Amino acid sequence: MANSPQAKKRARQNEARFQINKARRSRIRTFLRRVEEAIASGDKEAATAALRAAQPELMRGVTKGVFHKNTAARKMSRLAARVKVLG
């Protein structure tokens, strides 16, 4: 339990930041799931559109510190490769 005033403030800030990051992470995962679903359905047009929508969201997550840049790059690369294979 935080005892000093600054520790109490940090605890409040950490909780607020956690909630913001949780929402941001959830939003990004939703965009990635849409790409996965489009790939699973075999619709290249929808998959490409979903990938284009997901990319800026994922990069925004990197900027905001939710994901590491290499993690985001790896996810985008793997999704792009899977979309490219679709006929």
Curated annotation (Swiss-Prot):
InterPro entries: Ribosomal_bS20, Ribosomal_bS20_sf
GO biological process annotation, one example: translation
Membrane-spanning ranges: none
Family matches, as PANTHER family: 30S RIBOSOMAL PROTEIN S20, SMALL RIBOSOMAL SUBUNIT PROTEIN BS20C
Species in which this protein is naturally found: Roseobacter denitrificans (strain ATCC 33942 / OCh 114) (Erythrobacter sp. (strain OCh 114))
Any one Gene Ontology molecular-function term assigned to this protein's record: small ribosomal subunit rRNA binding
Its job: Binds directly to 16S ribosomal RNA.
Keyword Repeat: no
Cellular component annotations (GO), alphabetically ordered: small ribosomal subunit
The keyword Transferase appears for this protein: no
Family, similarity comment: Belongs to the bacterial ribosomal protein bS20 family.
Keyword annotations from UniProtKB, A to Z: Ribonucleoprotein, Ribosomal protein, RNA-binding, rRNA-binding
Gene3D superfamilies reported in the protein's UniProt record: Ribosomal protein S20 (1.20.58.110)
Protein name stated in the entry: Small ribosomal subunit protein bS20
